[in-house]
Amino acid sequence: MTNQKKFKRQETQIWQHLQWEPSPQQLEQFNQLQYLLREWNQKINLTRLIEGNDFWISQILDSLWPIQDELKFQDKQINIIDVGTGCGLPGLAVAIALPRSSTTLIDSIYRKTSAVKEIVKELGLLSRVNVLTERIELTGQKKLHRHTFDLAIARAVAKAPVLAEYLIPFLKPTGQAVMYKGKWNDLEKKELLKALSKLKGKIDTTKSLELPERRGIRHAIRISSTMLCPGKYPRSVGIPLKRPLNNQTSDNL
Ligand SMILES: C[S@@+](CC[C@H](N)C(=O)[O-])C[C@H]1O[C@@H](n2cnc3c(N)ncnc32)[C@H](O)[C@@H]1O
């Protein structure tokens, strides 16, 4: 089998996993994203997962499987935020897959966000994808962004209690946050629940997927608010990480 045919078969497998298939324009945008990441990676170190199935499985499938629920409603206009976006993922893959959504991507590292801004421009997504260079703790306290998102997502940014403090304040009362996790166990769940009790949040669902090609197991933890998140969260820059909310004495500012 030629490499091209073999790859076509693997690509089809990815969409089968998602029970969703991109339109020709979306597929073109995913291909363009791969090309642009490759180009930018030569200038600054953005990600090592760019070629072949490193990109299609470990980036695209890994970004999209946790939002399978949203993929079923392509026409819904939703407001999404990706915190700690790094090279632009999972946010850019989600923005391409949900063409009526508006997405905000945040990272505090300027060299990453300036590359991601250029990528957004090249992909033709400027009208509905906004890139911010900022600490999540500051964005989460701004009226413009607080309680304004239907979906808040984060992959590989921090441990669950820290992530919950970053994500919950962004949610509308009906919104949900999705934490993309590699490993997940009862201890982590217990720690997350402790943090959520302070943030007035709850766990809605926990899903898992074994990525193809033995790329490991992934978990998606969906959380939401039970009532409005107390105004003191997220705490000042660096505090959520230094004193995570699962720790009894952590709540002193
Ligand atoms: C390991 S990278 C993950 C990037 C991307 N989400 C992915 O899955 O490939 C974590 C990113 O989160 C950003 N980050 C972590 N804590 C942050 C904070 N408090 N405010 C803004 N960005 C943060 C870092 O700058 C880094 O780019």
UniProtKB/Swiss-Prot annotation:
Q: Which Pfam families match?
A: GidB
Name the UniProt key words of this record, in alphabetical order.
Cytoplasm, Methyltransferase, rRNA processing, S-adenosyl-L-methionine, Transferase
Q: Which domain of life is it from?
A: Bacteria
EC number(s) for this protein? 2.1.1.-
Instruction: Please name the InterPro entries in this protein's record.
Output: rRNA_ssu_MeTfrase_G, SAM-dependent_MTases_sf
| GO function term, MF aspect, one | rRNA (guanine-N7-)-methyltransferase activity
Localisation: Cytoplasm
- Cystine bridges: which residues? none
- A GO cellular-component term linked to this record: cytosol
- Chief localization class? cytoplasm
Q: Which residues participate in S-adenosyl-L-methionine binding?
A: G84, L89, I136, E137, R155
Tell me the function of this protein.
Specifically methylates the N7 position of a guanine in 16S rRNA.
Q: Provide the family line.
A: Belongs to the methyltransferase superfamily. RNA methyltransferase RsmG family.
- What is the protein name given in its UniProt record? Ribosomal RNA small subunit methyltransferase G
Source species: Prochlorococcus marinus (strain SARG / CCMP1375 / SS120)
What does the record give as the organism's lineage?
Answer: Bacteria, Bacillati, Cyanobacteriota, Cyanophyceae, Synechococcales
Q: Which gene encodes it?
A: rsmG
